[in-house]
Swiss-Prot record:
Organism field: Diaporthe leptostromiformis
Record's function text: Tyrosinase-like protein; part of the gene cluster that mediates the biosynthesis of the phomopsins, a group of hexapeptide mycotoxins which infects lupins and causes lupinosis disease in livestock. The pathway starts with the processing of the precursor phomA' by several endopeptidases including kexin proteases as well as the cluster-specific S41 family peptidase phomP1 and the oligopeptidase phomG' to produce 10 identical copies of the hexapeptide Tyr-Val-Ile-Pro-Ile-Asp.
GO molecular function terms attached to this record: metal ion binding; monooxygenase activity
Membrane topology: Single-pass membrane protein
Reported phenotype of the disruption mutant: Abolishes the formation of phomopsin A.
Known cofactor(s): Cu(2+)
InterPro entries: Di-copper_centre_dom_sf (IPR008922), Tyrosinase/Hemocyanin (IPR050316), Tyrosinase_Cu-bd (IPR002227)
The protein's annotated pathway: Mycotoxin biosynthesis
Full protein name: Tyrosinase-like protein phomQ1'
Binding site for Cu cation B: H279, H305
Superkingdom of the source species: Eukaryota
Cofactor binding, note field: Binds 2 copper ions per subunit.
PANTHER family in the record: TYROSINASE FAMILY MEMBER (PTHR11474), TYROSINASE-LIKE PROTEIN TYR-1-RELATED (PTHR11474:SF126)
Length: 378
């Protein structure tokens, strides 16, 4: 209607033409009415346009950026702690909750477990959650869903712990994380048959000889997963294997190397250096299940990625205004799209969660102290 009034003066001209067929005096007598009608219509048009412009500006200011209206801050965030700072009782409670998930039935496939569902979901979304802008936000949400499962299904009441591997960078295989009593068990059986990717069955600790349902596949542009029951497998790189490689991996998780990563000035430089450097060093050291997209088969995966999330959190806290909602990078795993253009990732992108939870926008998980996340690190 606005466009009709502005671009079609015939609506007004028709009245003028009708009165032109009358006497001159009649035309003169009705001119004030015509002018008044024209004035009223002009006022209406201008008022509507002005109102529309005001509404448009308000919508832009409210939704056109990612930081003008962030989620509300929570008042009492939970605190995630380093594994070795937990009491033996707290460590036992966490391990018991993880074991609980391994006995609950799957929602995806009969004969598998709820724990297996997290492995399945991680593998299915590999193109979006690795070597892409969403690498850090996706895993932050993934850890949240896992933590909620421990609480909702297994009665766990604490926060997800993390493994600060910089404390073990001089000797990763001696970390207390591998303790058979207060940890997750150690290396695979050195005398056993190789299961996958240099790994052998873990035979000590709370997850000894446990069965895992899924194996990850990577073909073409997409990641996939196949059903292939096998034992939890690890194959630590030790001095006798390759001293040069071991020294390199120890160097990648050293405090000085991690400090270099934290000094990166922007998100893309930070996440690219982090993912290919300190982050990747851990699966390359552990091998076995940990070396593939079905890495969550190993319960230590969650403590490893909680530390990854912690270091991102620390990087964000150095400049909250500039970094809390900063994201940049390819929208999908660029390694599997060679020769094809990969679009730029956006904070408005929806992250697929592999059936573990509703797909969610990246911007919803950027601030750990806001919205539904509500946690921080000690």
């Amino acid at each position: 209607m606005l466009w009709t009034l502005m671009s079609n003066p015939i609506l007004i001209g028709q009245s003028t033409h009708y009165y032109d067929s009358r006497s001159s005096s009649l035309r003169q007598r009705n001119q004030p009415k015509q002018l008044l009608l024209l004035l009223l219509r002009t006022i209406i048009v201008v008022s509507v346009i002005t109102f529309a412009a005001i509404i448009g500006c308000w919508v832009f200011l409210s939704h056109g950026t990612t930081t003008t209206n962030p989620p509300q801050q929570c008042s009492t965030p939970a605190v995630r702690k380093e594994w070795r700072s937990l009491s033996p009782s707290a460590q036992a409670k966490y391990i018991s909750a993880v074991q609980c998930l391994m006995y609950l039935p799957s929602v995806h496939k009969e004969g598998t477990t709820l724990y297996d569902d997290f492995v399945f979901g991680h593998s299915k979304t590999g193109s979006y959650s690795h070597y892409a802008a969403s690498f850090l936000p996706w895993h932050r949400m993934y850890l949240h869903v896992y933590e909620r499962a421990l609480r909702d299904h297994c009665g766990y009441s604490e926060s997800l712990p993390y493994w600060d591997w910089t404390l073990d960078s001089h000797h990763l295989s001696a970390s207390p994380i591998w303790d058979p009593v207060t940890g997750f068990g150690g290396d695979g059986n050195p005398g056993g048959a190789e299961t996958l990717h240099g790994g052998r069955c873990v035979v000590d600790g709370p997850f000894a000889n446990s069965t895992r349902a899924w194996r990850a596949l990577s073909e073409g542009h997409n990641h996939d997963v196949e059903y292939g029951p096998h034992c939890l497998s690890r194959g630590f790189i030790i001095n006798n294997d390759d001293r040069t490689t071991l020294d390199m991996l120890h160097g990648l998780v050293s405090p000085s190397r991690v400090a270099q990563t934290l000094d990166k000035p922007d998100y893309i430089a930070f996440f690219e250096d982090f993912e290919s450097g300190p982050h990747n060093a851990i699966p390359q050291f552990i091998r076995g299940d940990f070396l593939t997209f079905s890495a969550p088969n190993d319960p230590v995966f969650y403590l490893h990625h909680a530390n990854v999330d912690r270091l991102w959190w620390l990087w964000q806290q150095r400049d909250p205004v500039g970094r809390l909602y900063q994201v940049r990078g390819p929208a999908k795993d660029f390694r599997y799209h060679e020769g094809h253009e990969v679009s730029e990732g956006s904070i408005e992108d929806v992250m697929p969660m592999g059936g573990l939870a509703e797909d969610i926008k990246m911007k919803s998980v950027m601030d750990t102290r806001a919205g539904f996340l509500c946690y921080e690190y000690e």
